[in-house]
């Protein structure tokens, strides 16, 4: 089986081979090395990410294992409480989602009954979800005529004599709980269908949930330490045997991985006496170092590991940065060379444990030299980029694309007196993330040729992006940028599905769309009803000039980095949900998707196989390569 996987990896440059490889990854984790000997753990969830970073056909497959793990994600963002908006109808009043809908109803009724309003003003009322407690309050204020009566009881003729009583329809709604509707007109009332929505857009639009990007960038420097974890092969899979740091200590233990990690954590705690946060800098650490340690992470050690962050029980944080994500695809030695430090070779990962033990002294020496080189290169790069991209700091970002684009957006917006804002709360962040669709939409299963947008950067740099804080609107304004919660109805006739939905049997569903995606969907024949939106009154003008200025500055500093960065930005604009410019990514991806759809409009739908926001698969039998298709490159 190992031989089969090794052959597949060497030829993994086409869709069919990669899909076969995925089948193996459902059962095993592939242990591989790059040319410099750095270990790489390949599993089903990260193979796409690895392929976007490197040519996997050049990796050496060392073995297969089930004794390893994926990165441990941060605790999931709690799902926002489902929301029902207020409905004030001539026949009834349904309050918006609330812990105390009965209190909302009595306050609503006070708008029509002055004596209730006066009592509320003079005495107030405590929150309660009990009808009997509300009725007790009404009676104590001489307002028993407005007592609350359940609809079912009223229909039993028990309260006919109370003509002014407050009749409420009581119900329990899944994921919300008790809800009440005030029935204003018994003659015309029928229980309404109320949309239960995933977001409360009015809440999300609150000013305090949004902060200007520039205010979060100018942070003081935090202590930086280069680190590398080395793994050896055993019969039970790979184990970490050495953790090296610079400046700092090297920890080696062949007998107990637990003690190896605990000694490292004790050292970390000792050096954090004067700071609550430190930065560990590795190279390809997300592909090997962190997942390898995660497998063996001790319970009750006082630290939790989530993805690239260590959090102690007393709140201290260690952020593990991956310098590879700022290297634009360079090898470790090339990265060190291009940023002015002496390139040094590093110890090979995934060697036999016996070999590692026998050569431990030389491996420690080799590791320290390599880490010193990495540390010096990173310090040089971070210092240079933080001058050019001020006020951005490298440790505030997880990859160079985010840092570069944030710098450009900040500079352009500051020059125009407007700023881009980002959410400081999980719920608005989740709302923005929900408007992103990176999935492929399948149209027809057929043998196809793959096309990609020639330059994503050209498309997104000529568009406009939201500036300032958003406002809540019931329906978005044509010509303005907004993100809306939408009820989408699929066209009844044959159509190309342009709005992703994971249930083919549903013709109506609720989802989050940008104003750009809404326009695209309407062009494709979809019916869209907006259920509330975040709308921006101001736009950041096009970014093209700002991009060109920033590119020139970085090119003068380091041509190799600039050329590789440009290549990455031209081919990809991948959404990063932890980025402070997630709002930019949301609209950038929508603009790309609109561009893809404009090309699909020129092609007979029978030839379209599938598409994403940047790629289009067209039947191999399609020969009419028109002018629109010339804006894409065949892969």
UniProtKB/Swiss-Prot annotation:
It comes from the Viruses. One of its GO terms (biological process) is microtubule-dependent intracellular transport of viral material towards cell periphery. It is found in: Virion membrane; Host endosome. InterPro entries: Poxvirus_F12L (IPR005005), RNaseH-like_sf (IPR012337). Interacts with protein OPG164. Interacts with protein OPG064. Plays a role in intracellular enveloped virus (IEV) transport to the cell surface through microtubule transport. Together with protein OPG064, forms a complex that interacts with host KLC2 (kinesin light chain isoform 2) to engage the kinesin-1 complex and thereby promote IEV trafficking. Belongs to the orthopoxvirus OPG056 family. This is Protein OPG056. It comes from Vaccinia virus (strain Copenhagen).
